[in-house]
Amino acid sequence: PDVIIIEGQGALSHPTYLSSTAILRGSLPTAVILQHAPARTAISDFPMFAMPTPASEINLIETFADTKVIGLTINHENMTASEITAAITMYELELGIPATDALTRPTGRLLDMVFAAFPDLEVKPSIVAT
């Protein structure tokens, strides 16, 4: 296959979600799409740790895994539709990469991220889903 999608769990900055390190090292991704929850003020289950910024997480990922973050998805928990739209716009301007909410925006936006990062890929109509 031309593209393999590997779902991850947790962030490199999370104090207990070590599986993300194994996923990044083991899969050797050419590109990563990061997910961020803008309404969270602290890391899940650790209120003493402030939620990292997408910029800091991107820096960690790109340094640790020698890869490129090509997009950002928004975890919209505790956000209104207008807050989601504002967050997408803000992060696109701040980070210089495309952003979307995969659950409330057209899913084609995720494909757009991949095709923009890899222009030599051909659009193929077959999609395998599980």
Regions found by a protein language model. Give the residues of each.
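Short N-terminal or domain-adjacent regulatory/targeting segments
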Residues: 52-56, 121-126
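Hydrophobic "lid"/C-terminal helical patch
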Residues: 114, 118
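Charge-biased, low-complexity intrinsically disordered regions
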Residues: 102-105, 112, 123, 127
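Conserved catalytic-core segment of NTP-binding enzymes
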Residues: 3-106
